[in-house]
């Protein structure tokens, strides 16, 4: 029997008198086939260390621990720590850290792996309410995670993996794809969770690029420009950029020159631009002193 078997999950929750906290976005997966697929998608073996976020009662952790060198799992809810000590008692390669992943010194914790030089993968069923902040925090941490295989709301997975000229494409697509390739591996129906969420989920596989997707003079400025370009999706690039940089004649003159230099029409919308085009635009705007 597995932790994720419905009868086992139910028994564990009852034995510990556990009640779900909506504020933590707790939805526990009760489908062993899907858990197996997640671990297979992540290609976990004994030459990999794993960071997990939000283990719940350890359903995914169990599958990871059977194959990984070590698993370090971060759980914000202190009530789950004794439950995890119970459900994962047979594993000596799992460390449970009762801290908020957004506040923890992750680089310091990683040094506690027995072999910290092994590749580190992030495999997790992320809390829906805080998926994007967690992802961006990890991606921008400077820690060289080799890949992420993470479950999230399908809509968010679609946005992250979206290509130009699609409805889902936006500043989040650019922010992630600058650092990583992103592809939806498979869909997870809402019916396999306790309690069932209101939406379907997706497993997103993201692999770190050896170098960022495009070369830019100023990364922070590049992200600001891409974000500003999607402020109002139905507005043109010109309208969004004047809304961000200002509408003085001097600014308009600089914008005109930058757009011309980048080979872009003022009437185009942000959703039509590729990462390379945003890079060219950001560098041209920077060159104009904006």
From Swiss-Prot:
Mind telling me which PROSITE patterns this protein's record contains?
Answer: RRNA_A_DIMETH, SAM_RNA_A_N6_MT
**UniProt keywords, alphabetically:** Cytoplasm, Methyltransferase, RNA-binding, rRNA processing, S-adenosyl-L-methionine, Transferase
Q: Which Pfam families match?
A: RrnaAD
Describe the reaction catalysed, as an equation: adenosine(1518)/adenosine(1519) in 16S rRNA + 4 S-adenosyl-L-methionine = N(6)-dimethyladenosine(1518)/N(6)-dimethyladenosine(1519) in 16S rRNA + 4 S-adenosyl-L-homocysteine + 4 H(+)
Mind telling me which SUPFAM superfamilies this protein's record contains? S-adenosyl-L-methionine-dependent methyltransferases
- Cellular localization per UniProt: Cytoplasm
Enzyme Commission (EC) number: 2.1.1.182
Alphabetized SMART domains for the sequence: rADc (SM00650)
Which cellular component, as a GO term, is one annotated location? cytosol
Q: Which InterPro entries match?
A: KsgA/Erm, rRNA_Ade_diMease-like_C, rRNA_Ade_Mease_Trfase_CS, rRNA_Ade_methylase_Trfase_N, rRNA_adenine_dimethylase, SAM-dependent_MTases_sf
UniProt-annotated binding residues for S-adenosyl-L-methionine: 27, 29, 54, 75, 100, 125
Role noted for this protein:
Specifically dimethylates two adjacent adenosines (A1518 and A1519) in the loop of a conserved hairpin near the 3'-end of 16S rRNA in the 30S particle. May play a critical role in biogenesis of 30S subunits.
Q: Which family does it belong to?
A: Belongs to the class I-like SAM-binding methyltransferase superfamily. rRNA adenine N(6)-methyltransferase family. RsmA subfamily.
Q: Which NCBIfam families match?
A: ksgA
List the protein's name: Ribosomal RNA small subunit methyltransferase A
Q: Which organism is it from?
A: Streptococcus pneumoniae (strain CGSP14)
- Name the lineage: Bacteria, Bacillati, Bacillota, Bacilli, Lactobacillales
């Amino acid at each position: 029997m597995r932790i994720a078997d419905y009868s086992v999950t139910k028994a564990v929750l009852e034995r510990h008198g556990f009640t779900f906290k909506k504020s933590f976005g707790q939805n526990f997966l009760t489908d062993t086939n899907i858990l197996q697929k997640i671990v297979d998608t992540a290609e976990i073996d004994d030459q990999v260390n794993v960071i997990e976020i939000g283990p719940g009662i350890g359903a995914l952790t169990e599958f990871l621990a059977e194959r990984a060198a070590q698993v370090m799992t971060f759980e914000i809810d202190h009530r789950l720590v004794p439950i995890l000590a119970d459900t994962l008692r047979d594993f000596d390669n799992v460390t449970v850290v009762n801290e908020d992943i957004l506040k923890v010194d992750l680089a310091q914790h990683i040094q506690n792996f027995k072999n910290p030089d092994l590749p580190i993968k992030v495999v997790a069923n992320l809390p829906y309410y805080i998926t994007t902040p967690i992802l961006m925090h990890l991606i921008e941490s400077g820690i060289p995670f080799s890949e992420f295989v993470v479950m999230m709301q399908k809509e968010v997975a679609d946005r992250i993996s979206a290509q130009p000229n699609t409805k889902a494409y936006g500043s989040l697509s650019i922010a992630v794809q600058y650092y990583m390739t992103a592809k939806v591996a498979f869909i997870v129906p809402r019916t396999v969770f306790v309690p069932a969420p209101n939406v379907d989920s997706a497993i997103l596989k993201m692999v770190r690029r050896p170098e960022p997707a495009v070369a830019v003079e100023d990364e922070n400025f590049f992200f600001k420009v891409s974000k500003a370009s999607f402020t109002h999706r139905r507005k043109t690039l010109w309208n969004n950029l004047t809304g961000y940089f200002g509408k003085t004649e001097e600014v308009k003159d600089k914008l005109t020159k930058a757009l011309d230099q980048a080979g872009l029409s003022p009437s185009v919308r942000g959703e039509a631009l590729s990462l390379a085009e945003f890079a060219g635009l950001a560098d041209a705007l920077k060159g104009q002193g904006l």
